[in-house]
Amino acid sequence: MNYFLRFDTSLLPEEEAKVLICGSGIGGLATAISLKELGIEPLILTRGIGNTYYSQGGIAAAVLPDDSPYLHYCDTLRAGRYLNHELHTKLLTYEGIFRILDLERWGVDFDKKNGFYETTLEGGHSKPRVLKVKDYTGREIYTKLLKKTEELGIKILHGELQEIIIEENGVQGVIYSEEGSLKFIRTPLLILATGGAASMYYYTSNPKKVRGDAIGIAFRMGATVKNPEFVQFHPTVLKGTNLLISEAVRGEGAILVNDRGERFVNELLPRDEVARAIYNQIKRGREVYLDLRPVAQKGIKIEERFPTIYSFLRERGYDPYREPVPIIPAAHYYIGGIEVDDRGRTSIQGLYAVGECSCTGIHGANRLASNSLLEGVVFGHRTAYQVYLDLKILKPSKVNFRSERAGSDKPNLGIEELKKLMWNYVGLERDEEGLTYVKKRILSVLSQAKHWEPTPQNRQLYDILLVALCTVEGALMRKESRGVHYRKDYPTEREVYRRDTIITRDLFEL
């Protein structure tokens, strides 16, 4: 199946764009601003606030005199269990310093003390290199970049991507929905900056609007997906919510204890190790808590250093000065994604991807804390320069497009059931039996999808199922444990699997 919805572009309201960017996180906004500074007028399509806004910890860059991009590079490789794309990782850490200057030029005001960046230490880093704005770094970056796009006069449309129109000569445009109506944007250049797919898990830190279905749309249309088995689980999400408590809290001295008051893990280990340690405590029937009192004992005022965290803890009845708070691990970051090169190009002409929906390979098997915001701005900048060149040869077509798909059935699996399947069998611990069960279940559901009613809601479920299928297939193919991917039946790393997992549409009969 190529197009899921039924449409005729000749009957839809139409707009034309030289370059269309879907998504308004750091990747999308940085790309848009960079294009505008190159003299290109991009159009942004967004369905609202995404993960960038909620990022608390910060953005990693080797900006201090006793640090270096090479040390940052080495830390990133170590955390990624040496599956990282080495060239792309060097680009991240070396060019990252210059992109920090871009962010400041665009209005971001990082914390400083006596004229120097006030950085913090996070898990997996050998140096305190995480730049921050209190504990709302993402919100600061998002609001300042959004303000910059408005100052530059970049047009923003509000709507939801439904279909990518791709024909033999590449991208031709997109179908999107706005207030229940379908509309058409004609463009030869589409940049996806739509976020990851961690929300397909029952426990997740992702906001509801970040669904990952754009990865599924691109895959359905022929794009290659890379390393989808790697899903990072944040160790410390406040139990009963999707509110994460930043790594930076542990960097400042907070400790993890079980309900016996026992410490059971080094809090500054990489996220995958900390998350699994917590998960195993919970499996044994233990409750796990994050104790912030050691932070206060160092003389740090929690409400000043972590105002957002302090505020939502107090709103929910917790006093971090007096008691530890209950936490669980939750799906947080989709490390895999649409395969791209160092300039955001996918396997489809005219289709680019930046940020969490893409896979540059820089994170390897486990993302080093606070590298994701840096990836968005570094590769957003690089993608903008490639698009500037490609615009000379890629022009919009004048042809109209139709899809005659019909159907009236309802899906025989809902999104909540899928989330439970993914959490139970494709979560922090996996094995052949569980993965095979989920794969068969998803394929069975997808085999009936051609009869589903072609509604935007069913389209969304279909594309999320495709991403879930890629994730399961990747986990089955990788018969080892590496980084965030842990197989109980293959509990160690195997050198033969120090290679990328590539998933293409022709692997499945859909």
Curated annotation (Swiss-Prot):
Its EC number is 1.4.3.16. It holds the Pfam family Succ_DH_flav_C. It catalyses: L-aspartate + O2 = iminosuccinate + H2O2. One of its GO terms (biological process) is 'de novo' NAD biosynthetic process from L-aspartate. GO terms for cellular component: cytoplasm. InterPro entries: FAD-dep_OxRdtase_2_FAD-bd, FAD/NAD-bd_sf, Fum_R/Succ_DH_flav-like_C_sf, Fum_Rdtase/Succ_DH_flav-like_C, NadB, Succ_DH/fumarate_Rdtase_cat_sf. One of its GO terms (molecular function) is L-aspartate oxidase activity. FAD binds at residues 24-27, 51-58, 213, 356, 372-373. It is an enzyme of class 1 (oxidoreductase). The record marks E122 as: Important in orienting the L-aspartate substrate. Keywords: Cytoplasm, FAD, Flavoprotein, Nucleotide-binding, Oxidoreductase, Pyridine nucleotide biosynthesis. It comes from the Bacteria. Binds 1 FAD per subunit. Gene3D superfamilies: FAD/NAD(P)-binding domain, Fumarate reductase/succinate dehydrogenase flavoprotein-like, C-terminal domain, Succinate dehydrogenase/fumarate reductase flavoprotein, catalytic domain. The active site is at R271 (proton donor/acceptor). Its cofactor is FAD. Pathway: Cofactor biosynthesis; NAD(+) biosynthesis; iminoaspartate from L-aspartate (oxidase route): step 1/1. It is found in: Cytoplasm. Belongs to the FAD-dependent oxidoreductase 2 family. NadB subfamily. Catalyzes the oxidation of L-aspartate to iminoaspartate, the first step in the de novo biosynthesis of NAD(+). This is L-aspartate oxidase. It comes from Aquifex aeolicus (strain VF5).
